Amino acid sequence: DREDIKHWLNLSRNGFADKLHKTYPMLDKTFLDICYLAALGLSIDEIAQYAGNIKRRSVERYMSLICQEVQYPMSGKKGFESFINHILTI
């Protein structure tokens, strides 16, 4: 469940979920879920499975949309990974 994942991320990843929500409050629940699962180190295929059995291509599209939404200077899978790593380090 989302609250359990948020709690675990805050404990194990230096407050990741709280930092993400505070810094980017415009992200909707689907975008947050994708970010949370990526921060746990899941692959695109695993994210697709845990996000409700969506298609791999949908996850890749969400990653690009998240980068656009937060106005991250990079996009696509590499940009999204960079964005997640940035949040993990702040």
Indicate where each model-derived feature is located.
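Cytosolic nucleotide-binding catalytic cores of signal-transduction proteins
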Residues: R2-I90
